[in-house]
């Protein structure tokens, strides 16, 4: 019942590169049908994926509310703190408003509209999608009452999770938690800046005054995030076990700068993206996960887009390094990475990361693959490929095919023949872990449901939820394609806004049957830009040198070899120091000397490397004959 506590697992910067897997064959492009396999009605699924957000609304519901079983809720949010925090979205199956995943949700909804707004319009859904973006953006304007103040949470996860109540009946804490210069949160402030920058583009043509308001808040939040650095879960410990910032704030600062460049064309933000790529990890980290915590692949795809569109300015060399990491992400999803970090697959072909809400990563990856493929294809034949470490280069069409196969799996083309989108197809989850959907609607029975009565009378019911949570995507199956439709099985049946937000973009793309209309290309940019002088780009200073085997022995018919290696900081004298250096070693067998096992993946150098310094390490490999050295690569580092 905790949030994506598994999203803690989400934050791995992931082992990259790995074992080749076979890309599952995919079904035809535009299709009709229901959950259970074969062809799918992407337009219907798109409509439902957007409709779901109306079930997650907090605050005073509008007159055009389509989810009729919901009513007003959270009407005193922020009152005790002297600020109006009414509105926004509940994150998943509970009644807390967590700012971090909500901001990522708004970012991905806005990006979906920007890339595939024309397809949404053709399906009659663009207005609904823009309403969904605005519902979140309006809340973040309220949550940012001063340049260096941001409210990041309303409610308390601990007290909320001991209650099972409709949001309309809430009796749990509605305390609000904030960031300020004494309590910084660069990750949360950076992601909120990103959401508002992306949302400003959505409304640039239809409501320029509102768009400018969003952009002003975005700029202030970015400056706040950059000037007062720190992790938001250190300033707001109450959030740590629900939506902890495990990847740190470097990705959000780069993410925000990239989106502000997209929204303004102001070279200040492009310079920031380029000049901080090493220090904040954008050019160093390569990962196979993308979600509410880890934004690096999103930054890298966006940087690649700038490069492909000729918007790199003097920073083409640095943006190419970003693009190489975007390629690593794509290749890892395709099973064409190298070194042991490909995304796993279930027997039925679903990309698989973890048991808790795995589909959040599937929808996020599918969106990035589709967007990256479309921009590669738009750039021309010579650039419409991704070069992978293991296996032949991948065409843009392969990325789209993979994204489509994952969406088809979610909609029912899977071994169980079940749609993991509630309300789509004949077979779908009937007992989603969701308080509002699982208790009789307050409109049907206005009798108060207490904290404990909800558990006693509704949570444990064997029957289907009384209210249809139409369009919600649940956590999904396990690594063997297994799924138990039980309300208490929150790892598989809980829904989340960030599962749906990227999916709506992919569904629009598939419903349109072709490449995105790139709606943002027609949006008029402000012309009062301030151009700052560029700073020089630099190549990565970290270098690994593999040495010969230093020892060899046999055991149980296998040969073992110990190999030595050195890692060096090639920065010139007086240059920057390398810290938090993470190194990947492909399948060592035995101890590793000179490095420490990292908390989640790979190994970490226990000390920093000043300019010109080197450090030695060693590892063991085994084989039938004389085993060669393992693949060794730099996962990431910081320059200080």
UniProtKB/Swiss-Prot annotation:
UniProt note on tissues of expression: Expressed in roots, leaf sheaths and flowers.
Signal peptide: 1-24
Entries under Gene3D superfamilies matching the protein: 1.50.10.10
Reaction(s) catalysed (UniProt annotation): Endohydrolysis of (1->4)-beta-D-glucosidic linkages in cellulose, lichenin and cereal beta-D-glucans
GO cellular component: extracellular region
Record-linked SUPFAM superfamilies: Six-hairpin glycosidases (SSF48208)
Pfam families, A to Z: CBM49, Glyco_hydro_9
Cited InterPro entries: 6-hairpin_glycosidase_sf, 6hp_glycosidase-like_sf, CBM_49, Glyco_hydro_9, Glyco_hydro_9_Asp/Glu_AS, Glyco_hydro_9_His_AS
GO terms assigned for molecular function: carbohydrate binding; cellulase activity
Residues at the active site: 94, 433, 485, 494
Main location: secreted
Glycosylation site list: 528, 548
Gene Ontology biological-process entries: cell wall organization; cellulose catabolic process
E.C. code: 3.2.1.4
Localization (cell): Secreted
Top-level taxon in the UniProt lineage: Eukaryota
Keywords noted in UniProt: Carbohydrate metabolism, Cell wall biogenesis/degradation, Cellulose degradation, Glycoprotein, Glycosidase, Hydrolase, Polysaccharide degradation, Secreted, Signal
Family: Belongs to the glycosyl hydrolase 9 (cellulase E) family.
Cross-referenced PANTHER family: ENDO-1,4-BETA-GLUCANASE
Protein name: Endoglucanase 1
């Amino acid at each position: 019942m905790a949030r994506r506590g598994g999203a803690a697992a989400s934050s791995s910067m992931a082992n990259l590169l790995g074992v080749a897997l076979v890309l599952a064959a995919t079904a035809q492009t535009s299709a009709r049908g229901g959950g259970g396999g074969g062809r799918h009605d992407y337009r219907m699924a798109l409509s439902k994926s957007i409709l779901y957000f109306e079930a997650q609304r907090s605050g005073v519901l509008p007159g055009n509310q389509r989810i009729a079983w919901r009513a007003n809720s959270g009407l005193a949010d922020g009152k005790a703190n002297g600020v109006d925090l009414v509105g926004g979205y509940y994150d998943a199956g509970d009644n807390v408003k967590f700012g971090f995943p909500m901001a990522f949700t708004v970012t991905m909804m806005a990006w979906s509209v920007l890339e595939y707004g024309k397809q949404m319009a053709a399906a009659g859904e663009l207005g609904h999608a823009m309403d969904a973006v605005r519902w979140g953006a309006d809340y973040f304007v309220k949550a940012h009452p001063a340049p260096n103040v941001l409210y990041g949470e309303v409610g308390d996860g601990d007290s909320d999770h001991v209650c099972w109540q409709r949001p309309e009946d809430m009796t749990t804490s509605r305390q609000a938690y904030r960031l300020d210069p004494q309590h910084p949160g660069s990750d949360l402030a950076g992601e909120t800046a990103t959401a508002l920058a992306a949302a400003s583009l959505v409304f640039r043509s239809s409501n320029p005054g509102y768009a400018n308001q969003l952009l002003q808040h975005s700029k202030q939040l970015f400056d706040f995030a950059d000037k007062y650095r720190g992790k938001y879960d250190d300033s707001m410990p109450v959030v740590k076990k629900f939506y902890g910032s495990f990847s740190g704030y470097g990705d959000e600062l780069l993410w925000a700068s990239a989106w502000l460049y997209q929204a303004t064309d102001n070279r200040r933000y492009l310079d920031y993206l380029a000049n901080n790529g090493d220090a904040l990890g954008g050019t160093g980290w390569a990962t196979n996960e993308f979600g509410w915590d880890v934004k690096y692949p999103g930054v890298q795809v966006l940087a690649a887009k700038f490069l492909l569109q000729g918007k790199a300015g003097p920073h083409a060399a640095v943006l190419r390094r970003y693009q190489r990491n975007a390629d690593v992400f794509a290749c890892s999803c395709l099973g064409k990475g190298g070194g042991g970090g490909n995304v796993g697959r279930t027997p039925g072909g679903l990309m698989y990361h973890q048991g808790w809400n795995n589909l959040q990563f599937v929808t996020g990856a599918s969106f990035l693959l589709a967007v990256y493929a479309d921009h590669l294809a738009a750039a021309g034949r010579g650039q419409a490929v991704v070069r992978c470490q293991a296996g032949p280069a991948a065409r843009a069409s392969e990325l789209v095919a993979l994204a489509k196969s994952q969406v088809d799996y979610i909609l029912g083309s899977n071994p169980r023949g079940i749609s993991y989108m509630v309300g789509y197809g004949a077979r779908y989850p009937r007992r989603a872990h969701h308080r509002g959907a699982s208790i009789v609607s307050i409109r049907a029975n206005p009798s108060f449901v207490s904290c404990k009565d909800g558990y006693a009378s509704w949570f444990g019911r064997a029957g289907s939820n009384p209210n249809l949570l139409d369009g919600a995507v649940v956590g999904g199956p396990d690594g063997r394609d297994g799924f138990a439709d039980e309300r208490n099985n929150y790892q598989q049946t809980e829904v989340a806004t960030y599962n749906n937000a990227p999916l709506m973009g992919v569904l629009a793309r598939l419903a349109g049957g072709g490449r995105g209309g790139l709606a943002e290309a027609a949006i008029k940019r402000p012309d009062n830009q301030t151009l700052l002088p560029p700073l020089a780009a630099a190549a990565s200073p970290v270098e690994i040198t593999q040495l010969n085997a230093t020892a060899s022995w046999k055991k149980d018919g296998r040969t073992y070899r110990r190999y030595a290696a050195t890692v060096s900081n090639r920065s010139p004298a007086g240059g920057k120091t390398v810290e938090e250096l993470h190194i990947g070693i492909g399948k060592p067998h035995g101890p590793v000397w000179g490095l420490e096992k990292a908390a989640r993946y790979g190994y970490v150098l226990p000390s920093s490397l000043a300019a010109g310094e080197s450090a030695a390490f060693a590892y063991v490999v085994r084989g039938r004959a004389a085993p060669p050295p393992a693949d060794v690569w730099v996962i990431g580092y910081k320059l200080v």
